[in-house]
Amino acid sequence: MKLYRTGLLLLAVLCTIPVFAGQPPRLKVGSSSGIFGPVTNWTYETFAEAKRAGIDAIEISASTLFLNKEMTDDRQIEARCRQLKRDLKRAGIEIWSVHMPFGREIDLSQTDEAVRQRSVELHRRVLRFCKILSPRIVLFHPSWYLGHGERDARIAQLVRSVGELLPDVKKIGARVVIENMLGYELVKDGNYERPLGRTVEEVL
């Protein structure tokens, strides 16, 4: 009887394993928009070539798309976003995610409250444009390089900023993720520690 039950259990487990006829389904291949170079290269022809090379999805660099010094007019940026979405859709490439801006003066973890608030407002402005693009994911950069001994305070500020921006992300139908950073060594040099998110434990 015990052997019979074991056999049924094994059969049940095997029935849950997908059975593929021939080759398993192809996974989607994605890339950063960085492969296309400057925004002037972001054309349907470029995207179509990328699709032929096997690219199915893309992460848009918000810094490249929205923080171009020549593009300060909101209507101009909105028009660019609509054209970008049309060209990518026509080429068969999905806008999977948007990598939000980052830098010392646009740091969501800043302990200088004035800088943090400006950073949050900049992110809000970018998210309004992201609504046109309809990404699945919005990726926040956790921080710039930190001064020594700032990590706990910076983590608290990052959590605060993301909490303030979460409703804006939900409005565009996307999910928030926080970028994991490099740097197995905590200290970069005599002045700085590496950015937040450098270990799994820190992200959790």
Model-based region annotation:
Residues G7-P18:
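Bacterial N-terminal signal peptides
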Residues L9-L11, F66, L186:
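Extended rod-forming repeat segments used as scaffolds/tethers
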